[in-house]
Each structure stands twice: as structure tokens, then as C-alpha cells.
Amino acid sequence: MKHLFKFSLCALALTMGANTGFAQSGETGLKDAYKDYFSIGVAVNMRNISNPEQIAIIKKDFNSITAENDMKPQPTEPAYGQFNWENADKIANFCRSNGIKLRGHCLMWHAQIGEWMYKDEKGDLVSKEKLFQNMKHHITAIVERYKDVIYAWDVVNEAISDGGWQGGRRGMGEHPSPYRNSPLY
């Protein structure tokens, strides 16, 4: 499904570019060709903003960036109160220095979240109140840190399974239903 969406989006962009002549000229990037209509975004990671060829493409064609994984809960706070801002800061600074909008992705996602968020020191699930307290702690820290550069946040990503996964992830066990397989639900 994700590959189909990406393919469709690329096909749409190429088709629109072909209809206006911009894709063939090599002079006008997508972001400039459609600046009066909508933003053109791309998901990036550290490899993308460290590669000169990819940097050139990003600067030419895109005016909005989404951090692919580097702003998710696990990479930014692997343990309670132990933050690792290195990659997220680099992406934010890249956007600041190049005048590119940044979309935060994402504040909560069951697949990339530290167990500290939903389990106690004995490995038992925490209460709903403690879970909400942990979530608030994490969300407040990251939103405050990037409030000057992030224009929008994806708050919750894939809160429940869409049917493509039936258990087997660390800490989640097996579930007969494709729904309710997140420790956050």
C-alpha cells in the first residue's frame, strides 16, 4: 500500500510537471512550479541531508521536509529523560539554514517507542494515568525544542494496525485481531 501511494504521488508529480513543461526544462524545480498552489514535500533522513547530490535535489524541488524517523519517540528519547537530539537537530538546522518548512513526524507511534513509555521497571504495563504522564513529558520536550521551525506535527502515526501485522513485535505479543495491538491503545 505504501509503495502504491509513493508510486502514485511520483506519477502525479511527473504528469503535472510534463503538462507545464517544467520537468523537461531542468531549470525550475517542483516547489517553484507549484508555489502558488501547494507545498511540495519530501521525507528525509540523515543520509539524504548528508549527500551533496540529494541536498541539491531537496533544495531545488522541495519546500517542506518531514523527518522520516529522526523525530520519532524512540530515537529522540530512548529512555525516560535521556534525550538524543543529534539527528533531529541536524534536520531542523538544515531546514532553518535553507528556508525549508519542517513537518514534525511523529509525536507518538506504537512501532518506534521506548518501553519506558508504557512499561514500568518490572516490565509490567503502566496505568493509563502514568502512560499519559509519560506521553505528556515526551511531547512537551520535543514540541518546545522545535517550536521555532516546525509548522505542523503528525501527532499520532498508525495508532492501530491496518491489518498488515499480527503480533511479533517486541513487547506487544500476539493478538487475534488486527485492532488493539498497540500498547498505547
What is each of the regions a protein language model found here?
Residues 10-13, 32, 55, 143:
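Generic marker of residues within folded, mature protein domains
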Residues 24-64, 68:
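Boundary/entry segment of secreted carbohydrate-active catalytic domains
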Residues 7-9, 33-37, 177:
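A generic structural signal for short, non-catalytic loop/turn and secondary-structure boundary residues
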Residues 1-26:
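Bacterial Sec-dependent N-terminal signal peptides
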Residues 27-28, 60-78, 87-185:
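Substrate-binding cleft and catalytic face of glycoside hydrolase catalytic domains
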Residues 18, 22, 42-46, 131-133:
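A short linear-motif detector with a strong N-terminal bias
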Residues 81-82:
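Residue-level marker of alpha-helix boundaries and capping positions
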